[in-house]
């Protein structure tokens, strides 16, 4: 039998929560050496509903089987203005799964600051885990830095976040 369309009946048919969820940012500068795949450290938990992010090993373990939306941003700086490539990798259970790359067509074109972002929906089991890795290339083979501001400059330029997708 059909029910009368009321707000209560309508709302009862939809719902769920987008938790667990977390948002972590960098709490200190991190040096990334040239052409070296580096685990990105997001040790400042802004929030962690469900205790799914570990700020010691920088892992997201969802704790449920389903799908999560995962997002990361990497903002880097090289004082010598020699960055020509920035790669981001999402690792699942220790293996690279998704990548995004910001590259110039030639190492003759370089920048002082470069950002890369990765946004993806991932299917997982309750005990799968996710980590973020980055790689930078500079023309002078020097390192670059994942920067963290302070005071009025303390923006969330570098972050790792995820939330549950309601199905």
What do these predicted ranges mean?
Residues 1-15:
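Short, surface-exposed terminal/edge motifs of secreted or surface/virion proteins that either
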Residues 15-167:
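Extracellular jelly-roll beta-sandwich "head" domains, especially the C-terminal globular C1q domain
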């Amino acid at each position: 039998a059909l029910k009368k369309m009321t707000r209560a009946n309508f709302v009862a048919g939809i719902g769920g929560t987008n938790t667990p969820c977390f948002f972590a940012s960098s709490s200190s500068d991190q040096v990334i050496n040239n052409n070296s795949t580096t685990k990105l450290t997001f040790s400042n938990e802004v929030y962690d509903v469900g205790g799914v992010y570990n700020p010691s090993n920088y892992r997201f373990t969802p704790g449920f089987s389903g799908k999560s939306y995962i997002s990361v941003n990497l903002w880097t700086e090289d004082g010598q203005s020699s960055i020509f490539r920035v790669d981001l990798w999402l690792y699942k259970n220790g293996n690279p799964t998704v990548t995004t790359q910001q590259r110039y067509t030639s190492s003759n074109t370089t920048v002082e600051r470069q950002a890369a972002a990765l946004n993806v929906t991932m299917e997982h089991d309750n005990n799968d885990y996710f980590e973020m890795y980055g790689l930078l290339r500079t023309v002078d083979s020097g390192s670059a830095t994942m920067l963290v501001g302070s005071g009025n400059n303390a923006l969330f330029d570098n972050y790792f976040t995820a939330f549950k997708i309601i199905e």
